[in-house]
Regions:
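A glycine-rich helix N-cap at a beta->alpha junction
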Residues: 112-135, 154
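Active-site cores that bind ATP or allylic diphosphates and position pyrophosphate for catalysis
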Residues: 98, 102-104, 110, 147-308, ...
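Extended, domain-scale alpha-helical bundle/helix-rich regions
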Residues: 319-412
């Protein structure tokens, strides 16, 4: 810009122009524009399953995204958000719940609740009135547990957690029944109510489902439903001295909310038997269908929430939203748009088997989106003065440059032009390196939108 008050760095160069008024602007056309499905979208088997149900007459569709508020969401969660909320758009009247599975108060905080809500909205989705917490259902879950105790399907175990683990057996060996497995219903009810009243220390008792200690499915070998944990909850305070385990709270929360499809990642595939068992014992009408899909694994990228927490706690990064982090907040600070993330997830697809996705696919989606949406602006970081010797000293004109050559609606901007300009020092070499095609003595280059220049001489201070 000829009128900018910039420092003049040496060396200075003097250049001779050619055909100043006859030069055409250089344009760039992006490969594609954002929005809608990409031409190279990958298969989505969950979408196909749900669509088949709709085609067969399903009239009700309730999805849910159930994060635990113990950290910031990363790009793997973004895939789950997009999958669930997009499915809820397939049927009029359908919706997707945002439910916080807040059953482990030791690691949860309202900061994470707020950040998760911000990320979901930023990705372009709304839950409306359908925001819930597992803690909303603590009393209902407790009452359901009482029903299982009365039905002889749950009991209070007074073994240590270590003894319970050892008694589970293995894939090749049946489990060992707890010596407290055959307690009477009355004794179990009395102990469970005393657990609720806070009369016992942590580790004194747990409530276990009474299923089958010889089952080939280890999850069905009398899993723990409740443990004593005297830690204040971010919503309920000290009201509850015990908390439900994930496998107990999750499925029943789905049922309470009327969820039709519980979409989760493959690590929960071996939880499905227990998920269904609880629903059957409680007599849930039209129980949710659990469907598992492959989680997102990116090359050269850590997506373990526990590992990311260590980076934050140790001060290796400035926070969960550090631009180097693979969190949604970090990507947002890096300048990534929600359209780019949605396009990336669309190309990855939803598969049944775990695999690694090359991180270059994410980078390509980001570049493609930026190319289609970013205005073309120019700046000089390390200025080098250019004097156009055969241009009138007192003349000044302007050239119109497209803000985005691939998007006419983006408009244009006027770029001033005069005898003295500034280019970046990186664009000039007095002795050019191999394959250097920018400014050097005797070489001809084009100024974007303006003219051709040839370096005539170099003047040094």
């Amino acid at each position: 810009h000829p009128r900018m008050d910039l420092p003049i760095w040496t060396p200075a160069t003097t250049l001779v122009p050619h055909r100043v008024l006859a030069c055409a602007p250089v344009s760039e056309t992006p490969k594609s524009a954002p929005g809608g499905k990409s031409e190279d979208s990958a298969p989505n088997f969950v979408d196909e399953l749900v669509q088949a149900e709709i085609d067969a007459g399903r009239t009700r569709l309730v999805m849910r995204f159930p994060p635990e508020p113990n950290g910031y969401l990363h790009i793997g969660h973004a895939k789950s958000i997009i999958t669930n909320f997009s499915l809820a758009q397939k049927l009029p009247g359908a919706h997707c719940n945002l439910r916080f599975d807040d059953t482990n108060p030791a690691n949860e905080d309202t900061e994470f609740v707020e950040s998760i809500q911000e990320d979901v909205r930023w990705l372009g989705f709304e839950w409306g009135e359908h925001r819930y917490f597992a803690s909303d259902y603590f009393q209902q879950l407790y009452d359901m547990a009482i029903r299982l105790i009365v039905a002889g399907k749950a009991y209070v175990d007074s073994q240590s957690l270590e003894a319970i683990r050892d008694g589970r057996g293995s894939f090749h060996q049946a489990g060992v029944a707890s010596p407290f497995r055959d307690r009477s219903v009355d004794e179990n009810l009395a102990l469970f109510r005393r657990m609720r009243a806070g009369e016992f220390d942590e580790g004194a008792h747990v409530l276990r489902a009474k299923i089958d200690m010889a089952s080939k499915d280890l999850k069905l070998r009398d899993p723990v439903m409740y443990r004593i944990l005297k830690v204040p909850h971010h919503r309920t305070g000290t009201e509850w001295p015990m908390y439900p385990m994930y496998d107990w709270a999750h499925g029943q929360s789905d049922a309470i909310e009327g969820v039709t499809h519980s979409i989760c990642t493959l690590e929960f595939q071996n939880h499905r038997g227990l998920y269904d068992w609880f629903q059957e014992q409680l007599g849930v009408v039209d129980p949710p269908r659990q469907i598992e899909f492959a989680r997102l694994n990116l090359t050269y990228t850590v997506l373990s929430k526990r590992s990311l927490q260590k980076l934050v706690a140790a001060g290796h990064v400035s926070g969960w939203d550090d631009p180097r982090m693979p969190t949604v907040a970090g990507l947002r600070r890096r300048g990534v748009s929600p359209d780019a993330i949605r396009a990336f997830c669309d190309r990855v697809g939803v598969a049944k088997r775990d695999s690694f996705v090359d991180v270059t696919l994410l980078e390509h989606a980001i570049r493609e989106d930026l190319n289609a949406t970013s205005p073309r602006l120019m700046g000089v970081l390390r200025p080098l003065r250019v004097v156009i010797e055969n241009y009138p000293e007192d003349a000044e004109e302007s050239f119109d440059l497209a803000l985005n050559p691939g998007d006419e609606a983006a408009g244009s901007r006027a770029v001033p032009f005069c005898r003295e300009l500034f280019v970046d020092q990186e664009d000039f070499m007095e002795v050019p390196a191999p394959k250097f095609w920018r400014l050097f003595p005797g070489n001809e280059v084009r100024l974007r939108g303006a003219c051709l220049l040839t370096v005539n001489r170099v003047v040094k201070n």
